[in-house]
Amino acid sequence: SELSQDAVICWCLNWLNEPASNLYPLAVDLLRKMGEVTVESGQTLQTIQQFYKTDILICLTGKNRVILVEDKTDSSEHGEQIRRYRERMTQLSEEERRLCGIHENVELRTVYFKTGFLYDADRLVDADVTITGEAFLQCLTPYQGKSEILDAYLTFLERKLEQQAREKDFLQEPERLNNSAIAQHTLMRMIFPETLWKRGSVLYEVYHGSSFGRPWTEMVIAEYLFPTQKDGYRIFWRMDSDQDGTYLSLRFYDPYNKKDAAEK
């Protein structure tokens, strides 16, 4: 779960406070991945979980700098979480700042930490740094064998990434398209490469959802909004499945009021 992964991340970082430990370099490596280019000898930190719903808040002692981590396993950011948490950090009371060991005008860095598959929605997240499952695995692997906790999490992460790789390789098992959003995303991007997508535009962005437990995937290829009206139309591809397997359909959507005779 994400709360368990929060605990692992904090566990890794807290070794910075024990410079004699053989896992001290792990904390340094992870901080560098989070954007701390220089980690000085003697630097310490404080990690706080669920601080005003922020997954992890890392307070760097004596730096007046904090790192805000939004941690995900398989879900994606929703409701502009990072933006809201960033704004909340600028509104702390004097007592709250004291508890975090920071002052006014604190320097804030945001990290989007996701070990699951990165969908298009994840690529739009407004964070200073993004850390993927592959990047975290690369950071942890050199320290394998130095802790049972670390080894257990490494086994979990390796299996998770292997499963994602299998789902992407749907050509070996085409039936994965029926029940895997990762497989559907991969096929949609094979047909419509990411180079067609301009970040921030709905056109050629891959969307995902589910219906009765089955994943579906959509991509808008044309959109028109009438200048003098609130409505318009969209043309999009939809990948879905039924009893016969996975299919791709071209659809037209007009958001008119079906109960209004004039709009019909």
Predicted regions and their residues:
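A structured, charge-rich N-terminal accessory region that forms the first stable segment of a protein
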Residues: S1-K33
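Conserved catalytic cores of phosphodiester-cleaving nucleases, focusing on short active-site segments
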Residues: I9, I56-I58, R65-T73, Y85
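Active-site metal-binding core of divalent-cation-utilizing nuclease and nuclease-like domains
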Residues: D29-G62, H208-D231
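Short, flexible loop/turn elements at secondary-structure junctions
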Residues: L60-G62, K72-S75, M89, K114-F117, ...
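Gly/Pro-rich interdomain helix-loop hinge
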Residues: E80, R84, T90-G213
